[in-house]
Amino acid sequence: MVGISGRAGPSGSYNYSGHTDNPEPVSGRARDSNSEANSSNSPQVPPPLNAPASPMPAGRPRFLRSMALSSQTREWLEKGMPTEAEAGVPIRLQERAANTAPQARAEERHTQPADAAAPHARAERGRTLQAPASTSPLYTGAVPRANRIVQQLVEAGADLANIRTMFRNMLRGEEMILSRAEQNVFLQHFPDMLPCGIDRNSELAIALREALRRADSQQAARAPARTPPRSSVRTPERSPAPRTATESSSGSNQRSLLGRFAGLMTSNQRRPSSASNASTSQRPVDRNPPRINLMPTGANRVAMRNRGNNEADAALQALAQNGINMEDLRAALEAYIVWLRPIPLDIANALEGVGITPRFDNPEEAKVDNPLMNLSSALKRRLDA
């Protein structure tokens, strides 16, 4: 059922509208859409070229004349139709997307170089913030700084093993002993070392401890092996000679007086050459050893020794004139003195001819001053000269 209802407007006139059984309020948005549809369907005549510009848009008067408006709508239109954003009306999603898409594409074209350079700018900014102002770009990290400290210590002539021990003492807060140059190197990198010590958990301290350990190991590996100091005098080397029956049998007699003289009389033990004498003479020898429990040698003993040597020299000269072979004489004397083997008859007769008895009167007595011993010593000196 269609009915008619009247409502007084702001100017006192009545507005009439038709309604059905299910009345629905007519909103302002619906009226706006209806008015826009009516205005779009009606023919529009373009204004002449010389016509003055109207103070309002062409569609606004038609909208004002299309239907009766409320006082609020009329006031809103007379103020210049503010935008929906200014009036507090939410913007439709389609309009927002349509309006913002061209602007977004334009901004994207303009900002592509900036976005490409953004990672480099962020990296440079992070590097600038991380690097302290006082350090060189080559030694910004803890490990390069630790290697630089070790290099400065080596250039200062420091012993890395000692520095490693002293650095451990610093970290423990114990006493340390450093030279002035070493202390200056540490103060360059640890300014608060003397009053506050060094934090053992800091990154630089850990890196320096590891760098000192590596450098100390490398220095120890490069150092030559320490050998005990050698004597400047070299002992002359003797070629090993085959042991004779005399040497092998006389080994047990070396502790006795007879064995000592037998060792002096053997043919293989000769006096060293002049070169060996020159080398052995360089050794410091105590020419005056302390004499303990020794009786002073009397003048008669010295005279007796000299007389025995003189007699032996004279006897050797006489035997040589008689045609006795000195090597045969030496072998016969050694065999008799060591083994008590009988002296050959021709040599025994020659010895008796020069006044020397060719035998020991009592073999158990001492033979030091016996004429045969003096003759053997003189013969050995003569042959070795």
Swiss-Prot record:
Gene3D superfamilies: 1.20.1280.110, Effector protein HopAB, BAK1-interacting domain
Pfam families listed in its UniProt record: AvrPtoB_bdg
CDD domains recorded: HopAB_BID, HopAB_PID
Region (Disordered) residue spans: 1-61, 73-139, 215-293
InterPro entries to which the protein is assigned, alphabetical: HopAB_BAK-bd (IPR031759), HopAB_BAK-bd_sf (IPR038342), HopAB_PID (IPR033743)
GO BP term, example: symbiont-mediated perturbation of host programmed cell death
Subcellular localization: Secreted
Low complexity biased stretches: 217-234
Gene Ontology cellular-component terms listed: extracellular region
Region Host recognition, annotated ranges: 1-333
Biased composition (Polar residues): 245-256, 265-283
Keywords of the record: Hypersensitive response elicitation, Secreted, Virulence
Note: Unlike other effector proteins from the HopAB family, lacks the anti-PCD region and cannot inhibit cell death triggered by AvrPto/Pto.
Quaternary structure, from the entry: Interacts physically with plant cell Pto.
Family indicated by similarity: Belongs to the HopAB family.
Summary of the function given for this chain in its UniProt record: Effector protein involved in gene-for-gene resistance in tomato plants. It is recognized by the host Pto resistance protein and elicits Pto and Prf-dependent hypersensitive response (HR) and programmed cell death (PCD), resulting in host immunity. In susceptible plants, promotes virulence, in part, by enhancing the development of disease symptoms and bacterial growth.
Name recorded for this polypeptide: Effector protein hopAB3
Organism per entry: Pseudomonas syringae pv. maculicola
Taxonomic path: Bacteria, Pseudomonadati, Pseudomonadota, Gammaproteobacteria, Pseudomonadales
